[in-house]
């Protein structure tokens, strides 16, 4: 399968997910949040474009995964997964991926506000300029530096005094206007001054910074940013539930196909998770759904006109299986 076919396949998967939720919500989402996150895919052979990554301390690929969240729903729906070389910067491919998602989402949800959440590896002037030109909200992590450390110094002092007085972890918030030397203009930086205290340990300073164009209070902005942490659970499901890291083919494009097949399977499982509300599998992760609903002994009967699957008449999760089968369109 060549590059064009793989690109088309990736676009179709994203379009399918977005169209599915357009029908579910009737195009009435108020806000759609896009999360991007890279993840390491360790390699153990001579695959094309596998490189050593110092951050993860291993030879790997570095795929990037995108999810969308509608309004205040807890679910993050996977829409895109792109395989990248192991030494790729976090932001490689991000602008093209976001550009297409913006176009597709706006066509499906014309009145929705788009919001992007990213970690500090993506922070750069080209990214901020792109997001501002696209007219979207953004909350992006920002690595600390000498200048930002000076801006947060007073807050950190106050947090240390509070932590000492209470004997517990202390957090204080503030904001400032800041521009790095490579930035075209100043932007709002939300600061969190945190002093972490654990019994028997020396208190630890934990300053954090977030770049945003939102007008919300600093605590509210930082709370929005922290919600992206649930993305780690999506990555764990892809890795441990569906083995997205089985990219052992020697050719890079073949491994991209494997990643897309894993994404397609995950999209199906996420739909099962959504349809499982009201059952014992309502909060089940992919691994549990596989064990309870997919790993069944089936007798296959084939005739000239049809193929019949004879399922077991009794097994522990029969009622849940029937509920989900009917929810996705099966008839008895």
Residues of each region from the PLM?
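Short, conserved catalytic/metal-binding motifs centered on acidic residues
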Residues: 1, 32-40, 76, 114-123, ...
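Active-site-proximal, Lys/Arg-enriched surface segment
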Residues: 1-69
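Short acidic, glycine/serine/threonine-rich loops at helix termini
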Residues: 43-50, 78-80, 125-131, 150-155
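Electropositive, glycine- and tryptophan-enriched low-complexity nucleic-acid-binding patches
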Residues: 54-109
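An anionic, glycine-rich sequence signature occurring as long contiguous blocks
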Residues: 137-240, 323, 327-332
